[in-house]
Swiss-Prot record:
Keywords: Ribonucleoprotein, Ribosomal protein. Transmembrane segments: none annotated. This is Small ribosomal subunit protein eS17. It comes from Spodoptera frugiperda (Fall armyworm). One of its GO terms (cellular component) is cytosol. It comes from the Eukaryota. GO terms for biological process: translation. Belongs to the eukaryotic ribosomal protein eS17 family. GO terms for molecular function: structural constituent of ribosome. PANTHER family: 40S RIBOSOMAL PROTEIN S17 (PTHR10732:SF0).
Amino acid sequence: MGRVRTKTVKKAAKIIIEKYYTRLTLDFDTNKRICEEIAIIPTKPLRNKIAGFATHLMRRLRHSQVRGISIKLQEEERERRDNYVPEVSALEHDIIEVDPDTKDMLKMLDFNNINGLQLTQPATQGGYGGRRN
């Protein structure tokens, strides 16, 4: 079983990650030295706990987002993905292939004036009751 982390450890680690994300690594010893440099942590065990939790969060951040931590790099990446516009629309097709039954249905619904409809022959299947290998 793991230990319960206090609110102090969690808050300190999150703040350190948000401010110094580029300096932190996935290595505990490196993160311990960085925590020692950038923050005034009163005791050695508390410093180790904060560095350990920061390392834990960095490993989680490698795979996905962590709730409560907003990193500018991730926000920029998310914004870039949201604003992406493809050069060729996936919805625009010049030719729509339909079989004769679908063409008749479109005529009945008064959609026979759609541009780009191309009549194709339906693919024939073996039918029912046949032997399967």
